[in-house]
UniProtKB/Swiss-Prot annotation:
This is Ubiquinone/menaquinone biosynthesis C-methyltransferase UbiE. One of its GO terms (molecular function) is demethylmenaquinone methyltransferase activity. S-adenosyl-L-methionine binds at residues 70, 91, 117-118. It comes from Laribacter hongkongensis (strain HLHK9). It catalyses: a 2-demethylmenaquinol + S-adenosyl-L-methionine = a menaquinol + S-adenosyl-L-homocysteine + H(+); a 2-methoxy-6-(all-trans-polyprenyl)benzene-1,4-diol + S-adenosyl-L-methionine = a 5-methoxy-2-methyl-3-(all-trans-polyprenyl)benzene-1,4-diol + S-adenosyl-L-homocysteine + H(+). Pfam families: Ubie_methyltran. Pathway: Quinol/quinone metabolism; menaquinone biosynthesis; menaquinol from 1,4-dihydroxy-2-naphthoate: step 2/2; Cofactor biosynthesis; ubiquinone biosynthesis. It is an enzyme of class 2 (transferase).
Amino acid sequence: MDKTTHFGFKTVNEDDKAGRVAEVFHSVAKKYDVMNDLMSGGLHRIWKHFTLSTAGVRPGMKVLDIAGGTGDLARGWKKRVGKTGEVWLTDINSSMLTVGRDRLLDEGMILPVAIADAEKLPFPDSHFDLVSVAFGLRNMTHKDQALKEMCRVLKPGGKLLVLEFSKVWTPLKPVYDLYSFKALPLMGKLVARDADSYQYLAESIRMHPDQDTLKDMMLEAGFGKVDYHNLSAGVVALHKGYKL
């Protein structure tokens, strides 16, 4: 019997999810940054800045950015590791990766770039000081396997940062749901000419594990210590996992 998983609120075969997610991000890649600013009111920049500023990344470190998309975090990591460090920008989606690579090149920033599946990372054990994934984990079919891979490629003492939509503060939930399921698809239709992809976005956020569940998943994946910080009343959470 075929194994199933969630694609938003739909139940699909596991083998089909990656293709469906790929279609979403091929469709939205060119408008991704504009839509991020519109959907979050620019807050995504603050969330990412918090991630960068609390990571403790220093010159000479090796950093892997997974599902790095248009390169926001990779740019910030490169500025921090300097010429002696190493930052890899990776994504499973070629359209997103092309946008990110070209954007960084336009800024004069040359980074190694790779199409990579987070569930089968093409990197050796214990190679990176830090691994980051921002707004990408919820789209992965086997999150548990992806987290194990992230732990594998980290050096002992290394750190995983997961920045992801999470469970919002309960009193805000009615307003947040109205915004997510009415406003987001409408913005997607008007700006990106793609309401369906932004309907999936809203649904995928609701299906993603909450803060404590994700913490437990990271511990199960091999991280010795995990903590998290809620941002914007839990709209987003930053989880930090430490490989001991």
